């Protein structure tokens, strides 16, 4: 699957209304809310052979993109050290920080697949939370959802006939 197709399917299937993106720049932690994750923020990578070696979309920001997001309104919410103070990997720590900032209790890890909803609901808006370096989606997951939806549509169509 090409990057463009993977992005198109991800956007089509996503249960999120918007995204909270986080990144570390010069040891400071920033976050910004966006409607879509821009293609230039994503790279196609392969997971390790230990994890199956599957292709995936990965959220990656270089310093120029981080500087651009800061100019566009990313706000400093802490430091890189703050991420390390919270148990779990940096991505989980970032999610927990976002939950706490919004007065909510964190959900269990990976409790909802990305096409079913966001990571957090704030004022009725479902947000996916991603820290720089996070996996966005594996291509095989996109293929699985595509098959599920195709089968559901065929079942619904047969019921109409």
Put a short name on every predicted segment:
Residues 24, 32-77:
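Intrinsically disordered, low-complexity terminal regions enriched in charged/polar residues
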Residues 2-23, 85, 104, 129-161:
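Catalytic cores of nucleic-acid endonucleases
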Residues 20-21, 31-33, 121, 126-128:
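A structural signal for short, well-ordered beta-strand segments and their strand-loop junctions
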